[in-house]
């Protein structure tokens, strides 16, 4: 069964509500599509936000989230339960985003469009986006999860599989780098 047909099957099934994460996980392992719908309802918006801030546009973010749920569907039996299912989905989503960003960078290296000056009202956002692209991807992810998603360092550490202290240090470094990049003089 192809990924598209698996997702189409999931979209057509009736939805059910599962009271606990354990029940939901058991239903997902039985491939009950209503369980995957509940996973999407519970975590889809957060994953879309993370993906959007990682890849930079809605279409790619939607592709990354779709890929996330497809990988979760295929790999649910490998989920050990060492973390919350939402944490596991975030990890899959971040990896899907990184894969997509790498793919887009390779495509962009082949074709370079002409630069167009940003509209005045978009200048600050464009400067921030450019600065975010220039910092280390790991620090950028910590910054986005903390500043945009409002996650705690303990959640970030679990998702990124790093110590909590590393999350705090990377956030500090990301803020310092962004401040430097946004205030540096351009020739």
List PLM regions with ranges.
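Short, charged helix-capping/linker segments at alpha-helix termini
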Residues: 11-15, 29-38, 48-67, 164, ...
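Short, aromatic/basic-enriched loop-to-helix "N-cap" motif that marks the start
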Residues: 75-91, 164, 169
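Short, Lys/Arg-enriched C-terminal cap helix and immediately downstream tail that follows
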Residues: 80, 102, 135-138, 175-187
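Short, basic/polar amphipathic helix motif occurring as a linker/hinge flanking DNA-binding modules
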Residues: 90, 100-123
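Helix-turn-helix DNA-binding module
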Residues: 133, 137-138, 149-166, 180
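A short pre-motif secondary-structure segment
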Residues: 142-146
